Amino acid sequence: MHPLTVTIITLNEAAHIADAIDSASFADDILVVDSGSTDGTVDIARGKGVRVLTREWTGYVDQKNYAAEQASHDWIFSLDADERIPSALRDEIRATLADDPPFHGYRVPRVSFHLGRWIRTTDFYPDYQTRLYHRRFARWRGRYVHESVTVDGPSGQLKNDLQHYSFSDLRDQIQRINHYSTLAARQMYESGRRTGPVEIAIHPPAAFLRNYILRKGFLDGTAGLTISLMNAWSVGLKFMKLWELQRSPKSQIPNSKSQ
């Protein structure tokens, strides 16, 4: 069996890190890369007996690539602190690495717990993520948002879900939407994208219809309706912030440490 390192990058994840580490306990090596936590995250991780490195925050992609470089083994599973590897996925990972895997990277479906339930509708699911990969043939890429692993050659796909505790409540979701819509607008602006009233008017209702009707958000009741409305608002906010950047490019440039 090929040995595995699970990498976790952290910043003030005291509420999550212990459970994340416990879910990865089957791995041969667990590495936490912390970027200056002040809430006891590092002490909790070290108390679990895992390796902990500290490094100044330089962005999601750079931190995750650094973690992979510092791993003890070539096969990596990149786990966020608010995610859990349940037993079914654990067994599938071990079975995949038991022989010589035919692919250098594997996507996993991710299911999110929000508003009191596991959401298997809307754009929340299956939310495929490439998390299991061989570091010699794959690398994290991206700018401000939508970071992902780029694999040399085709990728495989696992069947069992990675669990994601996405938001603590609606207030948390609103705060994150505000933050990530700023980064998304900045990324679009720097890539040359521009917008106007037509896009701002059309994209939010289109996003709502896609999530609530086409992606069957209605099957999740009020939770599905709320998620669909939040998604529409997020899309609208992103385009409105892009429009604001066009008018005043310095108005929405967050400090790099806030990313």
Regions found by a protein language model. Give the residues of each.
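Cell-envelope/extracellular polymer assembly enzymes that use nucleotide-activated donors
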Residues: 3-5
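Conserved donor nucleotide-binding strand/loop of the catalytic core
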Residues: 42-70
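Acidic helix N-cap motif at the loop->helix transition within catalytic regions
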Residues: 18, 39-48, 88-89
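Short, well-formed alpha-helical segments that are part of the catalytic scaffolds
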Residues: 8-26
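Catalytic metal- and UDP-sugar-binding loop of GT-A-like glycosyltransferases, i.e.
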Residues: 33, 55, 77-81
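A conserved acidic beta->alpha catalytic loop
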Residues: 23, 34-43, 80
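Short, basic, low-complexity termini and linkers enriched in Ser/Thr/Gly/Pro
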Residues: 248-259
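Catalytic-site signature of metal-activated, phosphate-bearing donor transferases
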Residues: 62-68, 74-77, 86-248
